[in-house]
């Protein structure tokens, strides 16, 4: 047998082994009687079009959810791994709240692709360490602490209004068109810079400032970063050995230096600024006090280090930079396409403005605006910041409904996805879900729904939801007080079909027309 035949035989053997390895886990759903999609070798049920941004992902999520109507759980294979999607409201409540101790953690695969510093962030921590960090951070997000930081956010909102006013003055027309993803990313950037990192930046004036530029680079999902994440999922040990990073360490070092310098300056000069660094420094000092108390359980209490503090700042950055900007894009998009809603909201805003008699809007006034609250809640229903959240089962458990009927048997290591976006667009949960209707929140009924969860579910929901709501309401109040929001020529009329790929953005962007109110 010549060398070419040997090489061909080895190649065929390698292909067979690769095939067998790629499909080795594809019997999980069949063995457990779970409704599922037929997988392709290696890629599972993740279409290549979705990977390269050629598919309306949100629309496909709804279609998949609808296809499995009647099943409390359905499954797909993400590459080689089985993922259980939970669509039954009672089962979601069991997993997220009642039996939370069995489902404390997010998918452990997340930790495989986390850089060392981000592995210390609240979203990545597991078990007792997560609970400890959550308890440390919770006091920093109370209503009283939000009230302290409100002025910083309000200042950023006012700068955003000034920018549009200046653009209108420069325009030859009575209106201007803006791409809102860029606009709200700059707003979110300035809020995060001042609230989480203690620095004031006006990204509307200094368009290419370093903080904004590096933030854009870190939040941008490139094809190579997707490939690296997939390789981490397939070959976690190899990727760790090769020390391949998903994020650029130079960018992380930049933010690390900002936090370290801010902490050192404040400690040396006894500076107090009402922002996240100050609140986290307070939490750090409280932790040191707890550690010095010998009556505490020393095995439970661990030190809150500078790296822990930095990790939380980075987490706030990622959450604020992308999630807030996207949520504001969707919210203002709905307002421009629903003029009746916008007009009614403007009536409430102008009424509050007149009550203030020239005084600045306060946090308490903002939080008591009922219709503004309804509009924001409905926008978060239709376009939730997190399209899905996950839990990993810690130990085997049978889950039963209130009548004693078994809903699902979860096994240790199972990854359970709660498809928030699909649940919010399910007519069984919300009547006429594609219709933007703030009135569904008029009596609080929709808010109490077991499947309304824009910020997650249970004890592991988003700790910063109060701050997120404050940001959304603050900038929307200022924009509608000063401008009419109208559809532009490039405004998408079919977002579900136009949003493709990994980012929640239509292919042509979010375009709005602004007219100054008289």
Swiss-Prot record:
Q: Where is the signal peptide?
A: none
> Can you cite an annotated GO cellular component?
endoplasmic reticulum membrane
Keyword Oxidoreductase included in the entry's annotation: yes
Q: Which organism is it from?
A: Drosophila melanogaster
Residues recorded as binding heme, renumbered to this chain, are: 462
Cofactor or coenzyme needed: heme
Q: Does the keyword Metal-binding apply?
A: yes
**Taxonomy of the source species:** Eukaryota, Metazoa, Ecdysozoa, Arthropoda, Hexapoda
What is the top EC class of this enzyme, as a single word?
Answer: oxidoreductase
Which SUPFAM superfamilies does the record match to this protein? Cytochrome P450 (SSF48264)
Q: Which family does it belong to?
A: Belongs to the cytochrome P450 family.
What does the record give as the function of this protein?
A: May be involved in the metabolism of insect hormones and in the breakdown of synthetic insecticides.
Q: Which Pfam families match?
A: p450 (PF00067)
Which keywords does this chain's UniProt record carry? Endoplasmic reticulum, Heme, Iron, Membrane, Metal-binding, Microsome, Monooxygenase, Oxidoreductase
The terms under GO molecular function for this entry are: heme binding; iron ion binding; monooxygenase activity; oxidoreductase activity, acting on paired donors, with incorporation or reduction of molecular oxygen
Gene3D superfamilies found in the cross-reference section? Cytochrome P450 (1.10.630.10)
- The identity of this protein, by name, is Probable cytochrome P450 9h1
How is this protein situated with respect to the membrane? Peripheral membrane protein
Where is this gene product found? Endoplasmic reticulum membrane; Microsome membrane
Under the heading PANTHER family, the entry gives: CYP9F3-RELATED (PTHR24292:SF54), CYTOCHROME P450 (PTHR24292)
Its main localization is endoplasmic reticulum
EC annotation from Swiss-Prot or TrEMBL: 1.14.-.-
């Amino acid at each position: 047998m010549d060398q070419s035949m040997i090489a061909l035989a080895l190649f065929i053997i390698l292909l067979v082994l690769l095939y067998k390895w790629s499909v080795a886990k594809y019997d999980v759903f069949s063995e457990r009687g779970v409704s599922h999609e037929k997988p392709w070798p290696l890629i599972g049920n993740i279409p290549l079009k979705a990977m390269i941004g050629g598919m309306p992902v949100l629309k496909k999520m709804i279609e998949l959810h609808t296809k499995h109507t009647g099943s409390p759980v359905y499954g797909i294979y993400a590459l080689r791994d089985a993922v259980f999607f939970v669509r039954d409201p009672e089962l979601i409540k069991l997993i997220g709240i009642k039996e939370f101790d069995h489902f404390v953690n997010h998918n452990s695969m997340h930790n495989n692709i986390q850089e060392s510093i981000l592995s210390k962030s609240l979203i990545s921590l597991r078990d007792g360490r997560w609970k400890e960090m959550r308890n440390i951070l919770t006091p920093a997000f109370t209503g009283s602490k939000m009230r302290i930081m409100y002025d910083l956010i309000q200042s950023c909102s006012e700068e955003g209004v000034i920018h549009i006013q200046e653009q209108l003055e420069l325009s030859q027309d009575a209106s201007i068109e803006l791409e809102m993803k860029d606009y709200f990313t700059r707003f979110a950037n300035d809020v995060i810079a001042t609230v989480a990192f203690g620095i004031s930046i006006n990204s509307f004036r200094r368009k290419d400032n370093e903080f904004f530029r590096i933030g854009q680079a870190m939040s941008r999902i490139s094809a190579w970063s997707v490939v690296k994440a997939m390789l981490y999922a397939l070959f976690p040990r190899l990727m760790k050995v090769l020390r391949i990073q998903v994020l650029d360490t130079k960018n992380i070092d930049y933010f690390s230096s900002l936090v370290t310098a801010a902490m050192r300056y404040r400690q040396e000069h006894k500076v107090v600024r009402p922002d996240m660094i100050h609140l986290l420094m307070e939490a750090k000092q409280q932790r040191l006090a707890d550690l010095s108390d010998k009556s505490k359980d020393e095995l439970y209490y661990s030190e809150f280090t500078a790296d822990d503090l930095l990790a939380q700042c980075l987490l706030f950055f990622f959450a604020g930079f992308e999630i807030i900007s996207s949520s504001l894009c969707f919210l203002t998009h709905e307002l421009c396409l629903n003029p009746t809603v916008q007009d009614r909201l403007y009536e409430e805003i102008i009424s509050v403005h007149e009550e203030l008699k020239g005084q600045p809007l306060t946090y308490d006034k903002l939080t008591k605006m009922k219709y503004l609250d309804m509009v924001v809640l409905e926008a978060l229903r239709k376009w939730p910041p997190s399209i899905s959240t996950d839990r990993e089962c810690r130990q085997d458990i049978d889950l039963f409904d209130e009548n004693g009927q078994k809903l699902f048997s979860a096994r240790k290591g199972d990854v359970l996805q709660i498809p928030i976006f699909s649940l919010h667009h399910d007519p069984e949960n919300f009547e006429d879900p594609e219709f933007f209707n703030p009135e569904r929140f008029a009596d609080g009924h929709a808010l109490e729904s077991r499947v309304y969860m824009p910020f997650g579910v249970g004890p592991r929901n988003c700790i910063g939801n109060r701050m997120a709501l404050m940001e959304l309401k603050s900038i929307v109040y200022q924009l509608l007080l000063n401008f009419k929001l109208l559809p532009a020529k490039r405004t998408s009329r079919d977002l579900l079909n136009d949003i493709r790929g990994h980012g929640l953005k239509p292919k042509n962007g979010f375009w709005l027309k602004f007219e100054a109110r008289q």
